[in-house]
Amino acid sequence: MSQSVKRTAADKPLAPCPICGKPARTETKPFCSPRCADIDLGRWLGERYVIPGPEEDEMSYPPHSNDGNRSR
C-alpha cells in the first residue's frame, strides 16, 4: 500500500529574504533573520521606503502665521 503525504502550508517553501536573498525562516518571515528584519525597519524609519499618496496642494492648508502668537 502506498501512503499519501499531505502537504501543509508549513511545507511550502518561503520566498527569499527581501534584504539578502537567503531563504526566509518561519520565525522571522519574510526575513531570514532578526538582523535583516532590523535592517528593513531601519530603512522604513529612515524614510528610505515610502508609500506614495495623493499630491497635496499647498493651498489646502490653513494660512500659517509666524508672528509668535498662539491662538488659544
Swiss-Prot record:
Keywords: Metal-binding, Zinc
Region of interest (Disordered), residue spans: 52-72
Gene (name only): yacG
Cofactor note: Binds 1 zinc ion.
PANTHER family, per database record: DNA GYRASE INHIBITOR YACG (PTHR36150:SF1)
Binding site for Zn(2+): C17, C20, C32, C36
Protein name (database record): DNA gyrase inhibitor YacG
A Pfam family matched in the record: YacG
